[in-house]
Amino acid sequence: MLDNISKSNKYYLLDYCYMICLGKLVIYHSGDTLYYEGMEEWINRFNPTIALLPINGNDPSRKVAGNLNAEEAVKLSKRCNVQVVIPCHYDLFEFNTADVNEFIKAAKKYEQRFCVLELGGKFSSCEI
């Protein structure tokens, strides 16, 4: 997919995440991630417009890489002034999922704009 982006746009693969810059639109896809000190400062260097963040949390009994939980994802988005946060890492595997309704509650609580997509769903930047 990135091969089709014109040379005037940029993408960065940084550790295990992507920052995709398409003109003024900057998409941050964290991949598997846990919160760490200095995370906001690092993310804010790119001024992301949209963030795709995991919400399935960190439960060592699952024996898989841990992630942000719903509230952590929303708070991170808010602190990074992300215009729209899109949750991911839910409803894919029974043993490693989260209730997307907890994310929705947190987003409303912190007044963070969000978009919940169905599996295979689409989001248009025109919605921003």
Region spans (language model):
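Cap/insert and terminal regions of metallo-dependent hydrolase folds
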Residues: L34-G120
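Core dinuclear metal-dependent hydrolase active-site scaffold
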Residues: M1-F46, E118-I128
